[in-house]
Each structure stands twice: as structure tokens, then as C-alpha cells.
């Protein structure tokens, strides 16, 4: 409503109580009643430059917050560790040979491991990203960031099962990969 009012140059009212606005030879009907007593004037719009945002960092921060409250030093009841709740098997599969203490006390290792996992999953899931990105599957708008977040939660194998057979995976807390596809979809990430 407010943005419409900010662009009104002159107003008039018709018999049926519809407000008419005329701006640069363009007439717009606004279905508002009871506005006859308002004295509307044109307000010049102010343009503000919005800085470019780092979509990768926003994506990582969002996943980190969901997984651990963005805490690097936390271990959950299933033994998953750090900001992104890595399992020992995932770290080993990525080639990391660190102790739990080394991992929990090194934000640098955790961030590098997350980027390595995202790159690994993207490589394994590129066919599905190419095929389904922008499509609605089982009611979910599919995006690259959503697929990669789902793979982080449930593994790339479970993401493939979802696309091949519609099979839903949930982790030990009952969180589904489709909830991650929705929650973390739409980020413009560069992995």
C-alpha cells in the first residue's frame, strides 16, 4: 500500500468510491474506500544502493545455525561434531585425519571440511542439479543449494533415492532431507 501511495501525483475519486491515481498518463484503479479525506502528495523516491551480499557465507551461516547454533565446539548425542555437525565417517571419507579435539578447536578445519563436502556432493549430484533445478518435485522447488543442504543432512545417496524413487530420508532427530531442500533452497552459491 505505501509504495502505491508514494507514487501518486494527483488523485480523484469516482462515484463508486474507487480512488483513481494519474501518474505520467497512466491511470491506476485502487480499490480503497474511505480515502476521500486524505490529502495525498507525491513523494520523490529515494534510491539506496544495496551492497552485494555473499550468498555462500549466508548459506553456510544458515546451515551452521540450524546444525549447531553456529558453535564450533559442540558435539551432539549422536557424536556429530562442530558447527556443521560432521560425523567421523564423513571426515574420514574426505581425507581428514584429525582428533575430535583438533576438529572442535579449529574453525579453519571445519570451514575447509564443509567446503570440501559441498564440492564432493556437487560433483556426485551434478546430474540431478542439472535435471531438476527450477522444477517442482513432490511439492518442493528444487535448487542447487537445497540439494547440497539435503546431501549434507542425509548423504548424497539419500538425495539420489529421493529423486529416483521419491524415498524420504530423516536423520536421528526426525529432520527430513526435503525440509533441508526447502529451508536452504534459493541461495546463489558458488562451490
Where are these regions (language model features)?
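A short, structure-level motif marking secondary-structure boundaries and short turns
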Residues: 44-46, 72-74, 133-134
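Solvent-exposed, acidic/flexible segments
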Residues: 49-57, 76-84, 103-111, 141-145, ...
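Short, functionally critical alpha-helical segments immediately adjacent to catalytic or ligand/cofactor-binding
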Residues: 54-71, 114, 148-155
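Short, solvent-exposed loop/turn elements at domain surfaces
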Residues: 70-75, 92-94, 161
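Substrate-binding/active-site groove segments that recognize
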Residues: 77-97, 118, 152
